[in-house]
């Protein structure tokens, strides 16, 4: 595995990380999850990316990670870089969502308990909160680092101007933002058009890509219809409406290009952003 410096920090991260968004919850077979995580770690994927609401159900991916720490990974904690996030709806009531100090602090405490950890290496604000003052959210990140519950902090899916404010706020308090996370793939190049990709580079931040395969659209999974065990068929975040006739034509065209390159579509999609 090749490792790359994260922006202008001292952190080296693997070129490919393992995200535990949809396939590591209670609805999935634990032994299969365990096999995947062990395989990734054995091949140099040291970064495991989670969030409080990953599952399904919400929280269960972190519980899976906690079982892995207990069963296999505890002796290797210092070789792992584990991230989590908070900002999407997690529990009922006014404090289980968004970016208030109350919500972020409570969420991180719950995440640490589920994962059986004393700290996370990286904690993100998971999305922009238009109602909570930016200063409140950002100062909470500062205080989380100073409390020792996270070593670094990151921003995920914030708009350009709010992100720039966040970079400056955190830098001035000696808790610089390590990384920006955004969805980026051959079908979704929004980080280019909004400017947040270039912004991260100019500010010396890393950029973490999520959904590089567009939840499986950029693979051979849907070339010949919708498989019964696919994410679309299971009615999750990827809707049947996503696979339009136009999209399918694009998938097949990209698959042809990949074949001429001697690659699978998934391999080409990952190579594109690497």
List where the protein language model places each region.
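Conserved, mostly hydrophobic/aromatic
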Residues: 6, 18, 33, 40, ...
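N-terminal small/glycine-rich loop or linker at the start of catalytic domains
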Residues: 7-25, 83-96, 119, 124
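Short, well-ordered coil/turn segments that N-cap beta-strands
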Residues: 11-16, 44-46, 74-80, 117-121, ...
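Short, acidic/polar
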Residues: 27-41, 99-115, 163-167
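Alpha-helix N-cap and loop-to-helix initiation/capping positions
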Residues: 28-32, 60, 64, 95-103, ...
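Phosphate/pyrophosphate-binding loops at sites that engage ATP/ADP/AMP, CoA/4′-phosphopantetheine
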Residues: 73, 109-118, 262
């Amino acid at each position: 595995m090749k490792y790359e410096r994260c922006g202008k920090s001292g952190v080296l991260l693997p070129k490919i990380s393992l995200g535990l968004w949809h396939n590591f919850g209670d609805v999935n077979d634990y032994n299969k999850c365990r096999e995947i995580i062990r395989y990734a770690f054995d091949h140099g994927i040291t970064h495991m990316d989670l969030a409080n609401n990953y599952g399904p159900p919400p929280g269960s991916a972190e519980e899976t990670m906690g079982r892995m720490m207990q069963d296999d990974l505890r002796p290797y904690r210092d070789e792992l870089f584990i991230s989590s996030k908070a900002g999407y709806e997690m529990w009922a009531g006014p404090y289980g969502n968004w970016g208030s100090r109350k919500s972020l602090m409570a969420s991180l405490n719950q995440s640490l308990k589920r994962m059986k950890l004393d700290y996370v290496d990286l904690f993100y604000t998971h999305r922009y909160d238009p109602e909570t003052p930016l200063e409140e959210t950002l100062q909470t990140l500062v205080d989380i680092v100073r409390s020792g519950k996270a070593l670094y902090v990151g921003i995920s899916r914030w708009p350009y101007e709010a992100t720039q404010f966040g970079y400056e706020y955190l830098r001035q308090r000696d808790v610089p933002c390590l990384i920006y996370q955004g969805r980026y793939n051959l079908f979704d190049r929004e980080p280019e058009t909004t400017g947040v990709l270039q912004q991260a580079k100019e500010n010396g931040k890393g950029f973490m890509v999520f959904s590089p395969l567009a939840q499986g659209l950029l693979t051979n999974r849907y070339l010949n219809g919708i498989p019964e065990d696919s994410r679309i068929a299971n009615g999750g975040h990827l809707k049947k409406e996503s696979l339009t006739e136009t999209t399918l034509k694009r998938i097949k065209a990209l698959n042809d290009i990949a074949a001429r390159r001697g690659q699978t579509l998934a391999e080409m999609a990952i190579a594109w952003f690497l």
